[in-house]
Structures are given as structure tokens and as C-alpha cells.
């Protein structure tokens, strides 16, 4: 097996300025440390070698320094399953230039098992990758860059699915209709159209949905909540995209034009429906009799 390239600490680190670090409370600092530890643990479990050169560079520049509690494993066997089961990982502590000469200590750090409540959004997160995304979303940082297009990415592990955008790779294929997707989440959601599964049910009326976002949107019909209001006429909407679509009626703007007939539409749904007429495509099939239709409204 060929050896994997050496990865520096900079490849997995998320840098914060001194001002940003000062604004984070104790729980978020501890959370940041735990998330960084698990990111490094993932890389080590895959057989990557972690270089400590970045730590020395940070010390020379007087920036925030992260100190290691024990040596990184250099010849780790890439047994991902057993490595991810380890409860004790590398421990790292934030120190400054002032106390950098103090002796390094060893401390065990446990993988997060309890949900963390995000102070900015109020949502509970259990998995560290979710927590990482939550922190980066609020901070606005995108520390990883795509080599193909230069696009900045928030997650260390997002370059792989992002790369599939360039290669048009669709590795997840439905075994019922052979439709393919770039990630397993979209495939699972698609399979619900075959099985009829609707796991998200409204506790008020019992109506069920395939996606959690659809359930939340439906629940607003019970509460009467319409948070998106048009500043020109005062009309309010449940969803933001409905407001944007409505605003185009004031402008008289038609952004979607058919290249075959020249017909223009103010809404993407109307444009897609017109396009299907030209192609003859019938993507909406009945699960009971197999008859297919061009429009979902005809299927219903």
C-alpha cells in the first residue's frame, strides 16, 4: 500500500484572530479544541502523517499556539473502524508566547457524547462534524480551498463531494430506476418516492412529509406565521422564496427565457414546465400503475 502524503497542522486547523478568540466563551473554546482533535483523529485513522511544523511557525509569529499533549502516531495502520472507536485522543491546549516555554503536559480528551447547544442558533448538535459546520457558519470562515476552481469551503471533508461537481461524478445510484446522485443523502431522499415513506409527521394534523424542512414549512400554516413581508404592498409569506417570486411581479421581471420558443417566465417552475413540453420528458410516475406525467400536478 502506498504511503499517504504528510499533512501539516495547518491543513486541519481553523484559525481565529485574537479578537475573535476573545469573543468566544469557555464552552465554545473547549468545543473548538474537541472538534479539532476529532478532525486530526480522522486523518490519523486514514493513515496520514501529521507534521508539527505549523506549531513552530505560530510560535515565531506570536500568534495563537496549540500545544500537543502527546506525540502524533507516525505509522498508523489505516484501520478506520478501530481507530474511530478510541475514546482517548491527542490533547491540545491554547497557550501564548508568554508561557510557551512551560513543560508540555499530557491530558486525555474524550470524544463528545452529549449534545452541544449552539448559542447563536439555539439548535442541538451531537456529531462533531455538525458542530464544526455550525461554528464555521456563524464565524463566516471558509479555511479550505478547492484546487480546481479556488472556491473556499468550510469543511475539511467537503472537498471530496465538491470535487465531484467538477468531474460530474455521481457515485450513488438508485437500484430501482438507475437515477444517480452525488451524495447518499439525496439518494435516500429520492428512494422515498419509490417506497412512499414519509418519516416527518405533523403532530397537529397528522400530515406526513419526506423532508424535515417541508414539515417545518407546513407547521407555519397552523400557527399563521408569515415572517417574510413585501415592503411594497405589505403582503406576507411563509417562505422567503415565495416573497422573492412575489417581488418580481412588482418589477415585471421575467428572468427565465426558453431558448427554443423564446417564451419568458418570471418563475423557474413555469420555465421548467415549458421545457418538459419541448423534451417530452415525463419524470412523474405513478407507483401503482406506472403511468408517467410531465407535471407533478397531473400525477396528483
From Swiss-Prot:
Entry's localization field: Nucleus
Molecular function per GO: DNA-binding transcription factor activity, RNA polymerase II-specific; RNA polymerase II transcription regulatory region sequence-specific DNA binding; zinc ion binding
GO cellular component entries: chromatin; nucleus
UniProt domain KRAB: residue ranges: 7-78
Zinc-finger ranges (C2H2-type): 172-194, 200-222, 228-250
First-listed, main subcellular location of the protein, grouped into a coarse class: nucleus
GO biological process, one term: regulation of transcription by RNA polymerase II
Keywords: DNA-binding, Metal-binding, Nucleus, Repeat, Transcription, Transcription regulation, Zinc, Zinc-finger
Entry superkingdom: Eukaryota
Function: May be involved in transcriptional regulation.
Family: Belongs to the krueppel C2H2-type zinc-finger protein family.
UniProt-recorded name of the protein: Zinc finger protein 705A
Amino acid at each position: 500500500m502506498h504511503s499517504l502524503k504528510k499533512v501539516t497542522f495547518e491543513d486541519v486547523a481553523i484559525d481565529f484572530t485574537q479578537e475573535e478568540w476573545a469573543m468566544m466563551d469557555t464552552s465554545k473554546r473547549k468545543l473548538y479544541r474537541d472538534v479539532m482533535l476529532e478532525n486530526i483523529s480522522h486523518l490519523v485513522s486514514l493513515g496520514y502523517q501529521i507534521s508539527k511544523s505549523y506549531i513552530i511557525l505560530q510560535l515565531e509569529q506570536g500568534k495563537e499556539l496549540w500545544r500537543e499533549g502527546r506525540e502524533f502516531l507516525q505509522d498508523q495502520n489505516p484501520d478506520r473502524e478501530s481507530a474511530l472507536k478510541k475514546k482517548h485522543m491527542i490533547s491540545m491546549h491554547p497557550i501564548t508566547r508568554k508561557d510557551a516555554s512551560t513543560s508540555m503536559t499530557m491530558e486525555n480528551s474524550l470524544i463528545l457524547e452529549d449534545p452541544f447547544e449552539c448559542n447563536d442558533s439555539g439548535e442541538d448538535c451531537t456529531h462533531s462534524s455538525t458542530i464544526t459546520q455550525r461554528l464555521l457558519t456563524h464565524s463566516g470562515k471558509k479555511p479550505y480551498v478547492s484546487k480546481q476552481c479556488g472556491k473556499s469551503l468550510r469543511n475539511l471533508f467537503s472537498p471530496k463531494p465538491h470535487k465531484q461537481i467538477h468531474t460530474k461524478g455521481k457515485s450513488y445510484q438508485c437500484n430501482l430506476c438507475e437515477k444517480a446522485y452525488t451524495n447518499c443523502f439525496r439518494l435516500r431522499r429520492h428512494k422515498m418516492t419509490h417506497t412512499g415513506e414519509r418519516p416527518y409527521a405533523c403532530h397537529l394534523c397528522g400530515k406526513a412529509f419526506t423532508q424535515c424542512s417541508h414539515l417545518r414549512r407546513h407547521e407555519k400554516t397552523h400557527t399563521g406565521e408569515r415572517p417574510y413581508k413585501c415592503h411594497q404592498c405589505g403582503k406576507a409569506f411563509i417562505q422567503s422564496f415565495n416573497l422573492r417570486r412575489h417581488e418580481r411581479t412588482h418589477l415585471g421581471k421575467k428572468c427565465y427565457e426558453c431558448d427554443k420558443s423564446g417564451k419568458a417566465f418570471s418563475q423557474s417552475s413555469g420555465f421548467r414546465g415549458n421545457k418538459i413540453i419541448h423534451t417530452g420528458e415525463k419524470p412523474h410516475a405513478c407507483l401503482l400503475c406506472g403511468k408517467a406525467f410531465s407535471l407533478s400536478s397531473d400525477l396528483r
